[in-house]
Design a protein with these regions (language model features):
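Alpha/beta-hydrolase superfamily serine-hydrolase fold, recognizing
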Residues: 1-113
């Protein structure tokens, strides 16, 4: 339910403006590109109460359609930044382990090419 998301639309717009400044979003943000082909493998982790949930899953679908390897981890009931708020709980540790395992696999692939 988007009404329970702690990171809201206003915060999201501010965040993108602060991050991008005057940069071209299509260059600075891979998800804003029309063609996602050729991007590096991706790991996308998001909680069901994260404002970016729908945007993240749509990006993952676009990556997959473009032939980019993409692992998606959805955490039921989690909000944006949950793993930073409670880094020592099991769900956060599993989330971090998943990130690390995906990065290791991607780096192993890059060493073979």
């Amino acid at each position: 339910n988007p009404h329970y998301r702690l990171w809201n639309g206003r915060a999201n717009r501010f965040g993108w403006r602060a991050y991008l400044g005057d940069a071209d979003a299509r260059v600075a943000v891979p998800g804003r590109r029309d063609d996602l082909g050729g991007l590096a493998p991706a790991w996308i982790g998001v909680g069901t109460h994260d404002l970016l949930h729908d945007e993240d899953l749509a990006y993952a679908e676009r990556l997959t359609a473009a032939g980019v390897p993409c692992q998606v981890e959805v955490v039921e009931g989690a909000f944006h930044g949950f793993d930073r708020v409670a880094p020592n709980v099991g769900v956060s540790q599993r989330f971090f382990t998943s990130q690390c395992n995906s990065l290791r696999a991607a780096l192993a692939l890059s060493n073979r090419t």
